[in-house]
Amino acid sequence: MAPKKSTTKTTSKGKKPATSKGKEKSTSKAAIKKTTAKKEEASSKSYRELIIEGLTALKERKGSSRPALKKFIKENYPIVGSASNFDLYFNNAIKKGVEAGDFEQPKGPAGAVKLAKKKSPEVKKEKEVSPKPKQAATSVSATASKAKAASTKLAPKKVVKKKSPTVTAKKASSPSSLTYKEMILKSMPQLNDGKGSSRIVLKKYVKDTFSSKLKTSSNFDYLFNSAIKKCVENGELVQPKGPSGIIKLNKKKVKLST
């Protein structure tokens, strides 16, 4: 029988067992990296960008209140939220965002904040200019000018006829050219056998007789009364009982062919 070999456990002197200190160091380094990255991220963003991020994250249809937005920033960016002048910068960012058109406050400055809907720029359609119609127009104008030139050559000289005096006389005596004074003086002999008439009766007669020839009816009374006043001043009409009395025709001064 061969003797049993004695087995002895040998331990490696050079290698040391791993301790928990190395793990703690690695985790602390990772945490420091995360915090520094978050600090850099928060410092690189403006308050306006943080508010926009909060509005998109909260997704409230009617907008988010200021306290809700402040809470979001303080929870996600505690370094920014812990600043002493946080409220001042926060409110200024909202005010400038509203002025710039980035935010909306439908219920006023104390109301909720919403992201403004950006209007899509309207693209102006350029009018298509077709050169063909212009050429056609120029050709038509050229033919028209040629036709005019031909007509001017062939057309005989026009004989200017003198106007007949009867036409001018008719135009002068037409009722459309009568003044209020002339209408009143023509109406006076027809009323009460020329013995005089009241202002109301005379006015009615003038309206009925010259109704189609009166250009203005809105200021008829004013023009009628001013015409009577001028006739009285000129001596063509007489008012024996004063301005409110009857009106008579001064036959000595006025000679009318009825």
Curated annotation (Swiss-Prot):
SMART domains: H15. The keyword Electron transport does not apply. Residues 1-44, 101-171 are annotated as: Disordered. Residues 119-131 have a biased composition (Basic and acidic residues). Residues 43-117, 176-251 form the H15 domain. GO terms for cellular component: chromatin; nucleosome; nucleus; protein-DNA complex. It is found in: Nucleus; Chromosome. Belongs to the histone H1/H5 family. Present with 6560 molecules/cell in log phase SD medium. This is Histone H1. The lineage of its organism: Eukaryota, Fungi, Dikarya, Ascomycota, Saccharomycotina.
